[in-house]
Amino acid sequence: MPSTDLLTLKAFEPYLEILEVYSTKAKNYVNGHCTKYEPWQLIAWSVVWTLLIVWGYEFVFQPESLWSRFKKKCFKLTRKMPIIGRKIQDKLNKTKDDISKNMSFLKVDKEYVKALPSQGLSSSAVLEKLKEYSSMDAFWQEGRASGTVYSGEEKLTELLVKAYGDFAWSNPLHPDIFPGLRKIEAEIVRIACSLFNGGPDSCGCVTSGGTESILMACKAYRDLAFEKGIKTSEIVAPQSAHAAFNKAASYFGMKIVRVPLTKMMEVDVRAMRRAISRNTAMLVCSTPQFPHGVIDPVPEVAKLAVKYKIPLHVDACLGGFLTVFMEKAGYPLEHPFDFRVKGVTSISADTHKYGYAPKGSSLVLYSDKKYRNYQFFVDTDWQGGIYASPTIAGSRPGGISAACWAALMHFGENGYVEATKQIIKTARFLKSELENIKGIFVFGNPQLSVIALGSRDFDIYRLSNLMTAKGWNLNQLQFPPSIHFCITLLHARKRVAIQFLKDIRESVTQIMKNPKAKTTGMGAIYGMAQTTVDRNMVAELSSVFLDSLYSTDTVTQGSQMNGSPKPH
């Protein structure tokens, strides 16, 4: 009796014969068509078409999509058209002037120092001059700024200043000269690994801030992906993930794939699964994300990371040093978020936020040293010797690390738990009260310290303008239009939260008398920027702000900034 395999093969024989006939015809057609060409011509055409195909592939498949590049080209050509381009530029220049006029930090009534003094000043004279500069600072001591300063307590400040002073000349680049500083940084990393439930192989690095921590994780995963044969690595991140991931993509030649959010402002896990490709180098979650203070579903995304064998980075820069103390503070989170979750391979956390260290202090942590090794940079052939650097910077200020260590030791576990308790209690109180104010709503279900507000009745930027007029400083957000307030220890004081609610209620009541009125000032500029289709134009407007940071011209002298060739 014939076998099943033999019967199956015989069943396909007619189809194989047909295929052979057509393949023979195709071969004869091609051979006949090529007889009129000489061999060198066939080779030349093959080379030309191969190059064209390779060029076409590289042109289409770039980190920036073809559609995005097409739009940029169209907008660029439009701005070069004689009449339309001139009108666009005039409007752009007017907007730049409006932005400059609304920059409060440029309104300085004292002359800028533009050259070294001929004779050096005494210590007392220098300190007296510095008092003039510190007196320009805004109202942060009163607790009216969103985030920005996370403690500001006088005794803590004295401790941090003393710790910095003792290590002012130290540099982690030279551990042989400053072994005590090396010990300090190693202890900071180990303490953080323990707080985030890292195992014995967990490790990390001290960085200059959250952006550098994120950059380092992205660099590590890019190099890991490259080793696997992925030439253009993709970062799959929620729409709400920090802009530092875009910066990493720009710096390191990666592509960022943004994933939409659910109505609760969490990442859509199913959409994230669809976004994963053979070029995906890393997945991203936030705990919490900056815009709305919402925590992404880390365990669900971690399952994708494990299934597809992709590293998962959890960005805890903003709330990391709250999340690790939430349970002991009496506010347990619904889901784990750290190295306890299988699939989480790295975490970024800022010690200079709720770790209460001075600015310029953050951490990037890894579940295993094998990931951190890809972060390192080593040049074995430099004439100056073998150069090895763990992070972006070479030399770093040891005083910052010493002050960070001092803050950790000063607060201790009990101190951090108590601080977390005060902040979350204040945040939960504000959230419950804000949800009951007619005309505004709270985005998602923020569980930590950030509360984002929106409105279906009026332009929310009007509320930001009115609160600014009352002395508050809120963060303006976009897509969708919203504002947020980040609660710190300064806001946990008795009357700050009450005054904030009072001013919000008064402002909303005033707006609701004429809800359709147009926004003015910076709110209008921000709203306009959000609706502008040409994002390059928005970037150009943003450069006005960046230029202004280094302006040494008084407001009355015009709007020309340092580094600008001429006034616009």
UniProtKB/Swiss-Prot annotation:
GO terms for cellular component: endoplasmic reticulum; endoplasmic reticulum membrane. The modification N6-(pyridoxal phosphate)lysine is found at residue 353. Residues 63-568 are cytoplasmic. It is a single-pass type III membrane protein. The modification Phosphoserine is found at residue 564. SUPFAM superfamilies: PLP-dependent transferases. Keywords: Acetylation, Apoptosis, Endoplasmic reticulum, Lipid metabolism, Lyase, Membrane, Nitration, Phosphoprotein, Pyridoxal phosphate, Signal-anchor, Sphingolipid metabolism, Transmembrane, Transmembrane helix. Its cofactor is pyridoxal 5'-phosphate. One of its GO terms (molecular function) is pyridoxal phosphate binding. One of its GO terms (biological process) is apoptotic process. It is an enzyme of class 4 (lyase). Its EC number is 4.1.2.27. Pathway: Lipid metabolism; sphingolipid metabolism. Residues 1-41 are lumenal. It catalyses: sphinganine 1-phosphate = hexadecanal + phosphoethanolamine; sphing-4-enine 1-phosphate = (2E)-hexadecenal + phosphoethanolamine. The modification 3'-nitrotyrosine is found at residues 356, 366. InterPro entries: GrpII_AminoAcid_Decarb (IPR050477), PyrdxlP-dep_de-COase (IPR002129), PyrdxlP-dep_Trfase (IPR015424), PyrdxlP-dep_Trfase_major (IPR015421), PyrdxlP-dep_Trfase_small (IPR015422). The modification N6-acetyllysine is found at residue 353. The chain crosses the membrane at residues 42-62. It is found in: Endoplasmic reticulum membrane. Homodimer. Cleaves phosphorylated sphingoid bases (PSBs), such as sphingosine-1-phosphate, into fatty aldehydes and phosphoethanolamine. Elevates stress-induced ceramide production and apoptosis. Required for global lipid homeostasis in liver and cholesterol homeostasis in fibroblasts. Involved in the regulation of pro-inflammatory response and neutrophil trafficking. Modulates neuronal autophagy via phosphoethanolamine production which regulates accumulation of aggregate-prone proteins such as APP. Seems to play a role in establishing neuronal contact sites and axonal maintenance. Belongs to the group II decarboxylase family. Sphingosine-1-phosphate lyase subfamily. This is Sphingosine-1-phosphate lyase 1. It comes from Pongo abelii (Sumatran orangutan).
